[in-house]
């Protein structure tokens, strides 16, 4: 299964594994608001995870 990370106002990136996707998503969050990083640890494989900060959002989800 491929995992997509979408950053609002930016392009999507596709990853081969959930760990790669979360590593990338974590970097995006660290650059903006490190306090919500704990939420990524709750992501389960196959589920949508999305976090909003300011006028931007980060979504991590499986590719259909």
For each of these PLM feature ranges, what is it?
Residues 16-36, 40:
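A short, charged, amphipathic alpha-helix used as a generic interaction element across diverse proteins
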Residues 36, 47-48:
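A subset of signal/propeptide-processing and intrinsically disordered low-complexity segments
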Residues 1-11, 42-45, 53-57:
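Short aromatic-glycine-(Arg/Gly/Cys) micro-motifs in beta-strand/loop hairpins
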């Amino acid at each position: 299964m491929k995992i997509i990370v979408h950053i609002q106002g930016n392009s999507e990136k596709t990853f081969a594994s959930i760990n790669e996707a979360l590593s990338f998503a974590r970097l995006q969050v660290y650059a903006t608001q490190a306090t919500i990083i704990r939420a990524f640890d709750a992501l389960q494989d196959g589920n949508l995870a999305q976090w909003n900060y300011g006028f931007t959002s980060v979504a991590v989800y499986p590719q259909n």
